[in-house]
């Protein structure tokens, strides 16, 4: 009964937001204008930033705002979606897969021992501020990520490049940090010398976290670079109205002739999925992410819309803070794992676009362990384990729920209510805690939670990005919000990271997954195939499995 009532309240809220969308307000901080009505999204973009020079203006609506526009300083997918348009990396991924292709480097060589990587850079490339892209710019960026004492690391201002530490074995001076030297051979040739092999070094070079920022912009903006991004990408930054919109304009001097095709891109925040769909159908926006799976069939049947499906490349999960009571108790974690009905969540909320998960790693990935036994939904076993944990009379806990829809969890509010209902059936009273997106990420990173909801989308096609990022002890307090620290797991992950034998790497990852499953620092819920939609005026749009696709080739039909 409680669940039905809560869903009714969510329904009322959705209706309110839909009405707000119909009046033209797509942001969280909407209010009436002096004339008593709101301008529509496109009019707001022009009013705030001036007219675009051409008529190719695309509005991309999403559920939440970006956290930072300094790519390496955040793991937030909504940030990477934007920085992908502004910046470029030495290498790029194929439009539809994680195949590594040339980027700012047109060619590269790898030594036989896997310890030297030489990149040959494109010539005649300029940053958006007019300065030259060269090998020294590459070196400056990698050094600032690796060295917290670097003048452009901005550590005193709270910058932490956790993803660099995860993907390159730590930071300057750390025992496992693999980048030993960076040698500028000439303006357009640079060599990376490694202390030991790294099985996914080239994939790292294509990730959205490690593109090249203008050194002149780092000097000019200092720690404000996260709000003043300057790269070499197809679009340049214009403005950012927090929790409302980010505006990018075509970079006229982009290195690839004929691109981009759009004159302007506006990334608009519309928190409610239903409101975004109303805006899409009305022509107010052109692309929406976070489509409710239940709405997919209706979109597919609509002649004015196009339905897209991303590859199954993510995990939606519930995580425990294992260093904090009461979830420092493994029996309690096992009890909760058995109490949550993953099948019901997958069937009720994903409309066939998800499969229940047993481990964090997606099934298509190398090293996926299909022999790990999932915690089956079993309330009786959950009650027994609850008693074993010392909570025969039940207990009260907090569940922190995500405030925005993400590709791995399009309706977090309802998921949290299902989990609340499941746990109360076995004697656990759940209080749902809600925060705005940026504070949510910060507070869970700081360990203020007991139990929380989040997810992870792959950005380089390698298992390490899931398992080490989420569960390696070195990442406690950053991407490891479970505060999970198991030396044996870390050793398997370290060995997998440093091997260039893919079969050996797969074995290490499989062994790590067995230990992780038994420790149960999280409840893997589902691997989803996120759906999104565009109007049929949008051409050449290809959604990437990473959720961060370039819009350089996209255009609007006349």
Describe every region a protein language model picked out:
Residues 223-226, 253-298:
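Ligand-site clamp/hinge motif
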Residues 387-460, 530:
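Ligand/substrate-recognition segments at binding pockets and active sites
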């Amino acid at each position: 009964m409680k669940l039905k009532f809560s869903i009714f309240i969510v329904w009322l809220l959705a209706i309110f937001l839909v009405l707000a969308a119909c009046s033209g307000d797509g942001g969280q901080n909407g209010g009436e204008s002096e004339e008593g009505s709101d301008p529509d999204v496109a009019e707001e973009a022009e009013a705030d930033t001036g007219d675009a020079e051409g008529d190719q203006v695309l509005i991309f609506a999403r559920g939440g705002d970006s956290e930072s526009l300094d790519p390496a300083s955040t793991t937030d997918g909504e940030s990477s979606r934007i920085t992908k348009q502004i910046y470029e990396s030495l290498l790029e991924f194929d439009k539809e897969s994680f195949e590594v292709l040339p980027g700012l480097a047109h060619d590269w060589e790898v030594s036989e021992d896997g310890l030297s990587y030489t990149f040959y850079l494109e010539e005649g490339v300029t940053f958006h501020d007019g300065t030259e892209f060269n090998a020294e710019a590459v070196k400056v960026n990698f050094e600032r990520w690796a060295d917290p004492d670097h003048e452009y690391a901005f550590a005193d201002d709270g910058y932490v490049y956790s993803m660099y530490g995860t993907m390159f074995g730590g930071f300057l001076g750390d025992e496992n940090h693999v980048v030993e030297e960076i040698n500028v051979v000439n303006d357009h040739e640079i060599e990376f010398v490694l202390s030991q092999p790294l099985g996914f070094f080239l994939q790292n070079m294509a990730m959205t976290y490690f593109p090249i920022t203008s050194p002149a912009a780092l000097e000019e903006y200092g720690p404000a670079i996260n709000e003043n991004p300057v790269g070499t990408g197809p679009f340049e930054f214009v403005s950012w109205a927090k929790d409302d919109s980010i505006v990018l304009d075509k970079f006229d001097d982009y290195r690839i002739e004929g691109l981009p095709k759009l004159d302007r891109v506006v990334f608009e925040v519309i928190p409610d999925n239903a409101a975004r769909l109303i805006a899409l159908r009305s022509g107010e926006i052109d692309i929406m992410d976070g489509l409710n799976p239940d709405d997919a069939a209706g979109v597919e049947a609509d002649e004015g819309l196009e339905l897209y499906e991303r590859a199954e490349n993510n995990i939606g999960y519930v995580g425990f803070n294992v260093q904090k009571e009461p979830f420092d108790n493994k029996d309690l974690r096992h009890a909760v794992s058995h109490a949550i009905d993953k099948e019901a969540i997958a069937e009720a909320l994903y409309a066939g676009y998800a499969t229940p998960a047993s481990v964090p790693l997606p099934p298509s990935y190398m090293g996926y362990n299909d022999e790990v036994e999932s915690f089956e939904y079993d309330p009786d076993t959950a009650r027994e384990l609850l008693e074993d944990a010392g909570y025969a009379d039940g207990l009260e806990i907090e569940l922190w729920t995500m405030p925005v829809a993400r590709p791995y969890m399009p309706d977090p509010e309802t998921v949290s209510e299902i989990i609340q209902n499941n746990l109360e059936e076995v004697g656990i009273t759940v209080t749902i805690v809600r925060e705005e997106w940026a504070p949510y990420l910060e507070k869970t990173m700081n360990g203020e939670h007991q139990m929380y909801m989040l997810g992870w989308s792959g950005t380089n096609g390698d298992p390490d990005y899931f398992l080490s990022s989420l569960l390696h002890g070195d990442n406690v307090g950053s991407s490891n919000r479970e505060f999970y620290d198991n030396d044996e797991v870390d050793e398997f992950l370290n060995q997998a990271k440093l091997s260039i034998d893919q079969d050996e790497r797969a074995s290490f990852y499989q062994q790590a997954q067995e230990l992780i499953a038994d420790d149960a620092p999280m409840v893997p819920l589902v691997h989803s195939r996120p759906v999104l939609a565009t109007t049929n005026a949008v051409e050449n749009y290809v959604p990437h499995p990473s959720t961060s696709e370039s819009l350089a080739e996209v255009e609007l039909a006349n």
